[in-house]
């Protein structure tokens, strides 16, 4: 009888976690020769790797009091549904990825269910920068922590939390090997144009606060030098809002949505 496939439940609530989750899925499929099945929450990149997301993570792209308050019922419902789905699936392990605000609530709620399912979190909360006390209590609902930076384990291991440094995807990826020539050719950008990339974030509140400032800066720069060409790489969670704001500015600015275009930009 063939071995049972490894069941892994992934929870990624933001585009950054979606990218990490997709990389993790590829690595695990390779490591297990495909003898693994995934369930959980994720975005487009994880969906391409075979995940059928429990819900659209655009619902979690919130930041700031004005957006959080009206979204509380929906977020709480997603937390309950995620935990209920984990209990139903009975995976071998649950891996929450980044998005600590959402992930920690899922982990705590699942622990209260006393399922005995191992709980792993991928991407340490930045306790070295703020809210250091979180490191003291994480062991209560996280069984193992995976960190991106080599100095991070020392902040958690003294508090009985097994922690492993696994490397940063930016260093391991081909982020520096984007094809700028192909990007210019695809969008007919003249060689003399100087490309400036505008990065307003992946949360609605970030975009609302930052993009107007960036657009006004772009307007002023265009008035002083016509050789600037502005590109706004964006993700599905905020793409509609970004495009509306760019159109409303009246400026000729390219919004890059595909992974390839974002990479090449």
Regions found by a protein language model. Name each.
Residues 106-107, 191, 243:
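A short acidic (Asp/Glu
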């Amino acid at each position: 009888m063939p071995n049972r496939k490894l069941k892994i439940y992934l929870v990624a609530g933001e585009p950054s976690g979606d990218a990490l989750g997709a990389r993790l899925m590829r690595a695990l499929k390779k490591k297990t020769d495909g003898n693994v099945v995934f369930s959980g929450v994720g975005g487009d990149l994880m969906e391409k790797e075979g995940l059928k997301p429990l819900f659209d993570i655009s619902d979690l792209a919130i930041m700031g009091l004005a957006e959080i308050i009206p979204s509380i019922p929906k977020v709480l419902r997603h937390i309950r549904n995620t935990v209920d789905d984990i209990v139903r699936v009975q995976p071998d392990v649950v891996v929450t990825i980044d998005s600590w605000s959402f992930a920690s609530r899922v982990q705590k709620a699942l622990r209260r269910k006393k399922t005995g399912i191992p709980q792993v979190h991928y991407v340490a909360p930045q306790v070295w920068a703020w809210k250091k006390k979180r490191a003291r209590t994480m062991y209560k609902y996280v069984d193992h922590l995976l960190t991106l930076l080599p100095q991070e384990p020392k902040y958690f291991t003294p508090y009985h939390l097994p922690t492993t440094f696994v490397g940063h995807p930016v260093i391991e990826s081909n982020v520096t090997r984007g094809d700028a020539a192909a990007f210019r050719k695809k969008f007919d950008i003249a060689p003399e144009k100087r490309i400036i990339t505008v990065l307003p974030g992946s949360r609605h509140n970030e975009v609302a606060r930052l993009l107007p400032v960036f657009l006004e800066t772009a307007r002023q720069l265009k008035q002083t030098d016509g050789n600037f060409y502005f590109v706004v790489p964006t993700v599905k969670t905020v793409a509609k809002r970004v495009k509306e704001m760019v159109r409303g500015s009246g400026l000729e600015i390219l919004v890059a949505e595909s992974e390839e275009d974002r990479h090449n930009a």
